[in-house]
């Protein structure tokens, strides 16, 4: 009898274990089919709206949002590719998608939605090879807090070069391109519009007026909205969404701006490729495009018909002559020197902000005195100081050399982060060059002041 009971108990245990295993497999399969994992650099104000609306339209589906900076998202997808659990990569910077495409980390997808033109401005909305899709357009420009500007007597800027003026000293904020894909596009836009040498000179003259280089891209609109600083160099939706939220903010596109699509792509070997495609279709649908006009989002739709529902004064890249004449952005050039440009910005600006700002302040003060008391020798010293700040440790030809650009593989999040090998050697030489020039520029400007 005891043997029979024991036998039945073992049989029952085996059946229970088998049932649990089958249940686990079933639940796992259900989770794979009904969970969509998205790596994105976009802020919660945007992702929350799309998550809620997509889940509402697809009951039982869960969107898992993994928030990462663009460069960190690229790194994550590369490092997890052998056991990929990500379905979609969703970010602004098209050159980031080119990096993933070149590493065979994106899957092709054919969009079914109609009504999306081939181009916005001069730039293709979708990747011509089919690996990623544009869902919104983006331009780059300047936002400012009107209340702050009135209190500090700051004029309204109309061009990048306006931010070089002494009146803006310590009133400007920007993120670093190594920390933000959209900021990288802004820097590249200026470099491509003005040329390598003149573009960096513009960038450094503006940076000399920075109050802050923020750790994250959204730190710039936060700083402007809160009045921590008055002016921010941003992607357009930061300025437009701040307006939508009721902040006293204005935004303009300078004449030298680029108009490029913000994108989404299916990751190669996505666990839920079918649902990933459905999310792309949702973004490009009438409903998805209208969501871009939400006051907390305020991005430029890629479907021209959506602008009929846009608020008054909302930019329209399909009929705004200023935006249609935007710079033809060279994506291949940007991608080829992506890490190099980021490293150069950090060495010359991010990590030497105090040195650059001190030299800039000395020049501003000397020029103010020179305006009152003209002096040829003092003017010569001031011009020499300006030239020293503008000097670059690398030529455009070197920057565009693919072998040299390939040296830059590691991104430094902060000055204390260590790089090794050839990249470390090059950055150390750059740093020595930059510090010497900034210090000498400050010294010459102070000498000029002594003559006035």
Name each model-derived stretch.
Residues 95-99, 225, 230-248:
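A ligand-binding cleft/hinge motif common to bilobed small-molecule-binding domains
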Residues 143-148, 259-273, 291-292:
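A bilobed periplasmic-binding-protein/Venus flytrap-type ligand-binding module shared by bacterial periplasmic
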Residues 364-452:
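C-terminal non-catalytic accessory extensions
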Residues 100-108, 127-129, 241-253:
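Ligand-binding "clamshell"
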Residues 202-207, 245-270:
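Periplasmic-binding protein-like
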């Amino acid at each position: 009898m005891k043997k029979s009971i024991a036998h039945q108990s073992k049989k029952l245990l085996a059946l229970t274990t088998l049932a649990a295993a089958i249940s686990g497999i079933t639940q796992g399969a259900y989770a794979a089919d009904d969970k969509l994992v998205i790596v994105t650099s976009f802020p919660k104000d945007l992702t929350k709206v799309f998550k809620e609306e997509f889940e509402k339209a697809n009951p039982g589906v869960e969107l898992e949002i993994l928030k990462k900076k663009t460069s960190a998202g690229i790194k994550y997808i590369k490092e997890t590719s052998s056991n990929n659990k990500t379905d979609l990569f969703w970010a602004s910077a098209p050159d980031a998608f080119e990096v993933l495409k070149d590493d065979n980390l994106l899957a092709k997808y054919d969009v079914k939605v109609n009504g999306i033109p081939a181009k916005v401005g001069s730039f293709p909305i979708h990747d011509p090879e089919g690996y990623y899709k544009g869902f919104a357009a983006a331009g780059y420009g300047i936002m400012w807090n009107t209340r702050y500007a009135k209190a500090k007597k700051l004029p309204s800027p109309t061009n990048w070069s306006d931010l070089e003026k002494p009146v803006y000293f310590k009133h400007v904020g920007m993120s670093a391109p190594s920390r933000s894909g959209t900021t990288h596009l802004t820097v590249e836009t200026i470099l491509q519009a003005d040329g390598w040498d003149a573009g960096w000179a513009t960038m450094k003259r503006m940076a000399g007026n920075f109050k802050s280089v923020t750790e994250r891209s959204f730190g710039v609109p936060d700083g402007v909205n809160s009045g921590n600083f008055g002016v921010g160099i941003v992607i357009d939706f930061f300025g437009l969404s701040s307006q939508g939220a009721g902040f006293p903010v204005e935004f303009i596109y300078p004449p030298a701006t680029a108009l490029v699509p913000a994108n989404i792509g299916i990751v190669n070997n996505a666990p839920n490729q079918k649902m990933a495609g459905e999310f792309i279709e949702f973004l490009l649908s009438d409903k998805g495009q209208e969501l871009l006009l939400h006051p907390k989002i305020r991005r430029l739709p890629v479907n021209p018909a959506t602008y009929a529902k846009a608020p008054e004064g909302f930019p329209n890249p399909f009929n705004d002559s200023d935006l249609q004449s935007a710079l033809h952005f060279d994506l291949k050039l940007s991608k080829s020197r992506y890490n190099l440009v980021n490293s150069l910005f950090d060495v010359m600006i991010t990590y030497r902000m105090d040195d650059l700002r001190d030299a800039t302040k000395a020049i501003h003060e000397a020029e103010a005195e020179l305006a009152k008391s003209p002096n040829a020798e003092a003017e010569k010293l001031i011009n020499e100081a300006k030239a020293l700040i503008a000097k670059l440790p690398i030529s455009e030809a070197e920057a565009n050399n693919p072998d040299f650009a390939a040296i830059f593989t590691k991104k430094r999040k902060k000055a204390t982060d260590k790089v090794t090998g050839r990249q470390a050697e090059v950055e150390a030489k750059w740093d020595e060059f930059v510090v010497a020039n900034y210090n000498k520029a400050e010294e010459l400007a102070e000498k000029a002041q002594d003559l006035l």
